[in-house]
Amino acid sequence: MSWKERLDNPTLSVWPHDYLRPHAEPFVEQGTYSISIPQLSGDYATLLAAWTALLYRVTGDDDIVLYVRDNKVLRFTITPELTFTQLQNKINEQLAELANVEGTNFDALSESLQKESGLERPPQLFRIACVTEDLQLDRYTHSPLDIGLQLHESSSDVSIVFNKLLFSQDRITILADQLTLFLTSVLQNAKQVFTKVSLITDSSTSILPDPKANLDWCGFVGCIHDIFQDNAEKFPERTCVVETPPINSTKTRTFTYKDINEASNIVAHYLINTGIKRGDVVMIYSSRGVDLMVCVMGVLKAGATFSVIDPAYPPARQTIYLGVAKPKGLIVIRAAGQLDQLVEDYITKELDLVSRIPSIAIQDNGTVEGGSLPSESGDVLASYTELKSTRTGVVVGPDSNPTLSFTSGSEGIPKGVLGRHFSLAYYFSWMAKQFNLSENDKFTMLSGIAHDPIQRDMFTPLFLGAQLYVPTQDDIGTPGRLAEWMGKYGCTVTHLTPAMGQLLTAQAVTPFPKLHHAFFVGDILTKRDCLRLQTLAENCCIVNMYGTTETQRAVSYFEVTSRSQDPHFLKKLKDVMPAGRGMKNVQLLVVNRNDRTQVCGVGEIGEIYVRAGGLAEGYRGLPDLNKEKFVNNWFVEEGHWNYLDKDLEAPWKEFWQGPRDRLYRTGDLGRYLPNGDCECCGRADDQVKIRGFRIELGEIDTNISQHPLVRENITLVRNNLEGEKCLVTYMVPRFDKPELENFKIEVPSNISDDPVVCGLIGYSPFTKDLKAFLKKRLASYAIPSLIIVLPKLPLNPNGKVDKPKLQFPTVKQLELVAKNSSIDINDSEFNQQEREIRDLWLECLPTKPTSISPEDSFFDLGGHSILATKMIFTVKKQLNVELPLGTIFKYPTIKAFAAEVSRLKSTDKIEEETTALTADYASDAASLIDTLPKSYPAARALGSPSEMAGPTTVNIFVTGVTGFLGSFILSDILNRTVTGVNFKIFAHVRAADETSGLDRIRKAGTVYGTWKEEYANSLQVVIGDLSKKNFGLTDDKWSHLSETIDIIIHNGALVHWVYPYSKLRNANVVSTINIMNLASEGKPKLFNFVSSTSVLDTNHYFELSDKLQQSGKEGIPESDDLMGSSLGLTSGYGQSKWAAEHIIRAAGKRGLRGSIIRPGYVTGASYNGSSNTDDFLLRFLKSAVQLGKIPDINNTVNMVPVDQVARVVVAASINPPCGDDLCVVHVNAHPRIIFKDYLYELKNYGYDVEIENYEQWKKTLEEAVIERSEDNALFPLLHMVLGDLEDSTKAPELDDKNAITSLRADIEWTNEDRTKGMGATPEQIGIYISFLESVGFLPHPKHFGDKALPNIKISEQQKELVASGAGARSSSAA
């Protein structure tokens, strides 16, 4: 392997550093820190292994790239479960391989790569080193090192050589201690898993949070509404709220503490007297202003829980919030307008309101009106005015719920977070002291009115006795106006989201020097955001507060000093502000992802948990999610703090659950800085995959924000017009910069009202410049496919970027762009072959890009996998070259694709991948066998029901349950009613949480007509990543699974007929090994694998089948060792199933028991045809109707109804046919049908189809699809059907004695004999056609045929779902 191949697209790991990377000379200032490690004794390989371990721990990068001794570069993949010994062995293997490779001049290599790839500058190849010779960080101009180790081989001394412009001395000192600590530990015990060795040094113990510390669990300071009432009685005439006037008015509305207190007392007494009880939810339909504060205080004084609906939300969305909240009371603020009729209807039908204030408004004189109800005359609040000075006397405690706030949830359903009174007031005294807040401050009401930060806006001044200023909507929404408002009214403290901060500074010129603190919440805060704000507010300290709705007021903080105090403070910081450290009695615990009993050391990436007494109570109505996200602190024993309140006597004691040491699992990744602050490193789930590449959205946005003409930006994953995922950046440029005019062209006046079209056309030169800018910083696959320039980013009512409004452009918009754009092409960039390919691509692409270069990818230019099929055929026809469809996936850029076309034309043959690939899958399987356990606990079959003693629960772990076959497997199991036996399914699902996982199962079952709601009682959803060790589950969850499960059915797979083995390996092979590992631990388990007859698709088995048939035998025996296809399989899918089977057989020799079940084509349900419409055979039916022709192919088809396949799978899993062995179970059709006869059944039911010679049929199809661009269901599969379908549809005959054995034993479990099997009779095909016609997949027959379509039963809901495309998912098995 050449150095170019070794260093293709390397991961440039970034060791956490303290200072911004310099962008001008000098780039490097070398520093050295030396330590002595006597135990090391000059052992370079051990030091390299330790350095690699630390690199993985601090970056999380599994692609390790290190500059090593002898002027070489080491590159390999690391996994977190390795012991240190295994890591050493892996590195020794790599070093041994490198020993035979000559070093090179890496600057020359960078320059060569630059030239080959047309890059603007030579690429950097590595950043981190471990050597034995003298280390110079700047040895290579194009690959300067950030940090490295130098081992002095003649001694035990090690030097850390580092760039002092990046790393602080404190960090290097801690790193030296961590290296010493790690080596000391692993040299004493090399069998430790390297990710579980503690990195907390003695020197860092004092700066990191102690997870066992007492965080004042019993420190309740009282309820915010009581504190407010006390303040109102102390200083009743002090100004409380100021509503500033709109632009066309001079009328300011000012309200005192007495006004607010009395008005809210009236509201509270009304609520209580109309039936609101302690803990009831009262929903407020609100506007921004004093009325909201009155309503909130009134609800709290009544002992109830307030929640807010913003009228800016669509009515349908409002009903969703109401459905989650289930309020007992409703208050409509007059200024918010009337409820939409849709909302009123929902309230009438779905809610049980006991109290309603129809139109509340506080008057200028402080009196309050509530409006009148239809059933009553007069104002609803009028009779309660006499109670305006009377407290309600309702007692609530620290664990009562004052707030219900919403946060995003799965399937578009928000989650309601119940707050606690403990948190609302606890932190204000500390904040006042820490940030110099007082009764003299003027706060602002800028947060979204339905967003939980609005609580800070209101409660902070009420606690302090300060003032709250309220702007108009015009003040907020007009660029530049909000800054004027801040300056005019002398506001001193504000709470903002970063998006609202950008709105405050956008086009602003008016300074507001009286602002001394701005608290930011809700999103990442960048240096750019801070600089813009402090340019206008030089006396403003900026506080970045990290927390979530679920942590309530319990947050961390990082303070940015004001410009007037330290003009250079921001210059020293990196681009994203750190989260900082916890406020009073709040901890950010960064927990080791591989051993949650450990807090991470400085620099180490882990998952952030928030520990505090002020966490929210949890999610309303979601107990399972609460268990997952709000967890008891495992660092102390449960009940450890109970002694603290044993003598507590308080009137609110009954509303107090006692000291609870809980953690909130944020899902964010973070690391500690050398001073103990914490910085966020992205989401544990914020990485997306597009075309197989792992992409970090935050990294893309950070790089885009560094372009000098970018003001705001956000990158999202969006589905393009064909439903494929792509990256789209939405961006607001620096309109105030004159240089922007150089990157702008005129937009036709007839389309100037569409901002998306205007942005795509008018700023196309700018987006081209930005893409060129990104090519220097990002891998090609991470560059957004589309960059859309907008005048501003839309904000939701909460002040955050409104992501749902940022969508992929419509067909009409893209057509307008294409019609009014010229393509910017520099012809000199392309060679002759590249020009040909470029022009052919442009013919195929649905919309023309504004610019194109040799490095552009087909997919980034707007192509997709279906379009790729058409493009490949066009290239084959026009350039007369034989081209496999997979070429475009392997060579996606114009440059690479053209080079491959040139190679094929010159050699006149397709690249001989088959031998390499076939060798790969067999040898890869052999190597993976070495990773298996030496033995598996021997499981025994359940036996017959009559043999089972007493009531028994059979626990079955099933994968692929949301797929076609998986839905039927699930229903087959749960439909069994055997006395004394209960089945429980542990269903693996990919989802955000268990609730959304169950929703996915329910929806899939509904689509395929199998779901019954009672199934939910017998289901346990398992959320995990099958490609990771232990599915990425915690040790506790994994242990519970391994000790509980009796039977495993691994049915999940990635089915793709184009992807090569390498792309399917993780999903179909590695995942299988990880699931087998479940069988190796805990209780003995039967392991059952749903494979595919595609493992038999070689000439060997076709010939063997013919030979066996001629001698009177059934077909390929189930006992065959499958070595006849160890070479020769041509589909990546078949290869991946073969590899998995081969590994499972090896495990069987080590004690694994169970079955390998091999279905062929899995077709619709026998009784009503319910089908997965994205199916080869069903597409062929539709294509035949569209084309009017069917090919004359006489192969038999092994197609079996899905309910029969599911029965065989479950029967073999419960009743393994080979007892104490592991064997194969064939699913064979009885009877089989000839391919053309299957299709010709259409004729019998009134469809116009004729049989045509296969070669003529191919020509007819190609002309229709390629030349006339007619729709055809086979379009995505043209590469297959226009190849050699006569060969590819061959299916060897199969012996299925094992299947019959299991089905016979299964009769006692089901009271049904399925041993005769099922297949494809003409009657069965009629049921399929009837189903497809009823869901709209096939048109209604044009005339009466010889047969009438049979009547079938399917629900209207199923019809709607299938018709909408929900049934067109890939099968879990094929």
From Swiss-Prot:
InterPro entries: AA_adenyl_dom, ACP-like_sf, AMP-bd_C_sf, AMP-binding_CS, AMP-dep_synth/lig_dom, ANL_N_sf, Far_NAD-bd, Lys2. Residues 828-905 form the Carrier domain. Its EC number is 1.2.1.31, 1.2.1.95. Binds 1 phosphopantetheine covalently. PROSITE patterns: AMP_BINDING, CARRIER, PHOSPHOPANTETHEINE. One of its GO terms (biological process) is lysine biosynthetic process via aminoadipic acid. Pfam families: AMP-binding (PF00501), NAD_binding_4 (PF07993), PP-binding (PF00550). PANTHER family: CARRIER DOMAIN-CONTAINING PROTEIN, L-2-AMINOADIPATE REDUCTASE. Heterodimer of an alpha and a beta subunit. This is L-2-aminoadipate reductase large subunit. It comes from Candida glabrata (strain ATCC 2001 / BCRC 20586 / JCM 3761 / NBRC 0622 / NRRL Y-65 / CBS 138). The lineage of its organism: Eukaryota, Fungi, Dikarya, Ascomycota, Saccharomycotina.
